[in-house]
Amino acid sequence: MGRIITLLIVFLASIASKSLANTPNQDTDVKGKVVNQDNQPVASASVYLMSASANVLIKSAVTDDQGNYVIIKAPKGSYYIEVTSVGYSQGKSAVFELGDNTYQVEDIKLTSSSQAIEAVTVQGQLPLVQNVNGKLVLNVENSAVAAGNNALEVIKRAPGVSVDKDDNLQLMGQQGVNVTIDGRQTFMTGDQLANFLKSTDGSQIKSVEVSTTRTAKDDAEGAVGTINIVLKKNRTEGFNGTFVASAAHGKYPRGNTSLNLNYKKNNTTLFGSYGYTNEKQLNELDLDREIENAGVTKYFSQKADMLEKSQNHNYRVGIEQKTSEMNTMLFQVSGNNYMEDSENSSVTNIGFTPTSVDTILRSPTTADMGLKRMSLNFNNEYKIDTLGAKLTLDLDWSMFKNRSNMDYRYRTENPSGNLFYPEELERSNMPTDIDIYVGKLDYVKPFKKGTLEAGLKYSNVKSDNNMLFEKMEDDVWENVLTRSNHFVYTEQISAGYLDYSKAFGKWNAKVGVRAEYTISDGHSITADTKVKRDYLDFFPSVNIGYNMNENHVLSLSYAKKVSRPNYRFLNPFRYYIDKLTYQLGNPYVNPQYTHGFTLNYTLKQMFNFTLGTDITNDAMVESMGQDAETNTTWVTRENLGKSLTSYLNMNIPLRVGNVWSMNNNITGIYMHFKGPIAGYEIDQGSFFVQANSMHTFKFSPQWSAEAAINGNTPFVYNLFKIHARIGVDVGATYNFKDQKSSLKLAVTDAFRSNRNNLSTDFHEFQSKIRQYHDNQTVRLTYTYKFGNLKQQIRKKDSNNEEKDRAAN
């Protein structure tokens, strides 16, 4: 692996040494002016650079007080300019060819509209999926299918993203995804992350960015890549807001509502939002198991219906202050309060043949859970000069308080309903407190022939989990010491990075290294044991790009990444899922390190193809075990063997006529694992396909419709065979003529086919799992915009146009 890294760096250096200092850059600027019919400048008009061949939006800008605009660093090609402004009809330039020199567009004259409206419909709106700076971006702001859903449901629709039976996010078929919000790390994985995303209002999301590569500036966490959730931001002058109300019905009714407010005057912007969700849903689980003991096989057939009722309040409030022409400050507070009550009616039939029943285990469980989250963020961006040098400071504090109380009742009966043993009563109380402190400083310095980026970051995480488990003995609750546990985990990461990028002719390159020093301490207070670690890691990254012309762009990248275990996986404790199944913590499980290689090809600025390979040694995998004496099954995490995953992701947008546009994302994945699992050596590979096809039909300015189809073919993942899955979502949108309100109707999982079915057939491990979340719903969402709805005025960093376009 070190040899490959060395070859990449040598290749980069050889290219740089052969480059001529005076080689012209491929990217050039487009300038122009927008005037009205009296030749007076039109300020704050939105200007769009459109590809003439593909008719898609490439870049954007806003005119200044004199009506002038500059679109910087546009690649060579054929384009035209499209202009919109409040009170004017749409303007358009002639098609022009952009070469090596700055192009001056003839003045575009706008005529007053006889039916001036307060908002303008932009014909060059962002496509549903686009490739921005090597990231696949899902734009969901106006999606009927995504409207009214939570963040987890929105993310599931992003290219290359899937969710397993436990709601763990996967990217290109792999776990180990780093989820960020507006570029800030959440520091959560597993069920903590899933519950957090379920409690996050999807109507606050503008887009979802998916990336399988990283630079030295990015956190090394996330072995397979990063999913960044970009929240909506509105910086329109004056007062404005948006009200959203959504009602849905699955097995039971559910609904949510939200209010977003924004006020901007001169250099001060105040913003805030509040959302409320009330849901009731039924999740179904069927589990069949076989356990052999002394040549005798027992069959267990479990059916569980889990009724969940939840409420969630989420909020965000903040202020952005431009203190000078060179400095901007931002302070915001966000959080949510999530409450859930659940009832699990589980029945397990036990017999010595698959059809006979000798024993029935009834284990109804009730639970109430609460999750409180609060985050404070301070950001200060100082522009050192007008050439792009800047210094950015980020300070974050986040607090999570998770409360979970469960009551268990076990009845072991014969088929006639008579008890074999006295009824058992148990209960648990599991509070978890997490505090996260993060400080980050980033510096950017452009030079004549390149750009230097450097930064420092410090994070401190403390997780305190105090599990109390009790059992009723002689009408008195007694503490079960073997199942109670107090575990405190602290982790400090100090990081620094250097990145240098350079463009020479048709070539560009970025090389960097990130260092992370980690100190961790896992302390089981109950067992009086500690596992301390401290280690220094270096994470190199290299990216080499070649812009052949506007139709052909290639890039090759390498990065070393890491996935750290969930805090709960490190807790040396048995976490019981039911009486016969538990998760076993492993305090000695180590982070896994992944070497990722990607080759990316973009055709005609539309079609994107990514070929990638991830190699992981000492892979952190899920292992299983069984106790034939007690009929229990346990699951744990261990560092076992080596995994290799190769994938080809193809993102293909197409347009059929003027009405129908689609985006097809197809990923072919090969996963191979070699190593011991559950006491047996495995050396196996599996190929499968994930696909997501989204279709938009624009019938008129008022009417549009959507359809989304997603699924995967069968594949093998460690001990599990994952069965094929398919889901179909449809929706329609009606925009009222006042341009302020809209109505969206959506049907999710229209054919009730989006199921999680899997099985194991591995030596003594024989099981079948059939799982269905309450996915099939009909949802109606109403949106109303009020206040000043004029075009948003945005002053953008001249070196980051496309990123701003995707993130604002």
Task: Give the ranges of each region predicted by the language model.
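Outer membrane beta-barrel strand-and-loop segments of large Gram-negative receptors
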Residues: K303, I436-K440, V480-N485, G596, ...
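Short acidic/polar hinge/loop motifs at secondary-structure boundaries
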Residues: A151, R157, Q185-T212
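Face-selective signature of the C-terminal outer-membrane beta-barrel domain
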Residues: R3, N314-Y338, T365-H523, N547, ...
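Outer-membrane beta-barrel signature, preferentially recognizing the C-terminal barrel domain
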Residues: N485-E491, V562-T610, I615, V635-S646, ...
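N-terminal periplasmic accessory domains that precede
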Residues: D107-K109, A151-V154, L193-F196, V210, ...
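Short, acidic, small-residue-rich periplasmic hinge/interaction motif at the N-terminus
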Residues: V35, Q40, S46-M50, T84-S89, ...
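Short, acidic Ser/Thr/Gly-rich low-complexity loop/linker segments typical of extracellular
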Residues: A52-N68
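Surface-exposed extracellular loop regions of Gram-negative outer-membrane beta-barrel proteins
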Residues: I519-D521, E550-G596, L611-T630, A750-H763
